[in-house]
A protein has these predicted regions:
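Acetyl-CoA-dependent GNAT
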Residues: 2-76, 81-83, 94-96, 100, ...
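C-terminal "cap" of GNAT-fold acetyltransferases
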Residues: 2-3, 10-11, 107-110, 114-128, ...
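Alpha-helix N-cap and coil->helix boundary residues
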Residues: 34-35, 88, 119
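Active-site acidic-Proline motif in GNAT/NAT acetyltransferases
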Residues: 81-83, 87, 115
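Short coil/turn segments at alpha/beta junctions that flank glycine-rich nucleotide-binding fingerprints
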Residues: 87, 103-107
Length: 153
């Protein structure tokens, strides 16, 4: 069965479980003060669109687009369960995020990820993101790696 990616509410029990796994995974690699989590409730806000990948109905991956001022979109909450890694599900979610950002007139995507997440770097770099300095209101930290991508028409 093919993995399907759709916009969904993060307030569903199984999606909240996926978010809890994401938070746990981040805290295993990064000090809490440098983990910039969003709760499921924050992810359900009007400024954020959440994409959920499902395999046979089970939530297996997520990612979100958070809208900021001046045409900037932020890639947030990217996670794929270990059982589904290596299948380019994360890349497909990033593609969906970028497509939505373009449709909504955004001109730039940015993101913050951890310094111990080389698999994530690969996903972003393959999607055309380049490393940059700190973005939005994130602190400049050795624990963070920042990326950006200019969106052209």
């Amino acid at each position: 069965m093919a993995v399907e990616i759709e916009v969904e509410t993060p307030l569903q029990d199984d999606v909240q479980g996926l978010i809890a796994e994401l938070n746990k995974a981040l805290l295993e690699l990064t000090p809490p003060e440098f983990c910039f989590h969003m709760t499921a409730e924050q992810m359900a806000a009007a400024d954020t669109t959440v994409f959920i990948a499902r395999d046979g109905g089970a939530a297996v991956a997520c990612g979100a687009l958070r809208r900021h001022e001046d045409g900037v979109g932020e890639v947030k909450r990217m996670y794929t369960r270990p059982s589904h890694r290596g299948r380019r599900i994360g890349a497909a979610i990033v593609d969906r995020i970028e497509t939505l950002a373009r449709q909504q007139g955004m001109t730039r995507l940015v993101l913050e990820t951890g310094d111990r997440h080389p698999a994530a770097w690969t996903v972003y770099e393959r999607a055309g993101f380049t490393r940059c300095g700190p973005v939005l209101d994130y602190p400049d930290s050795a624990w963070s790696v920042f990326y950006e991508k200019t969106l052209t028409a």
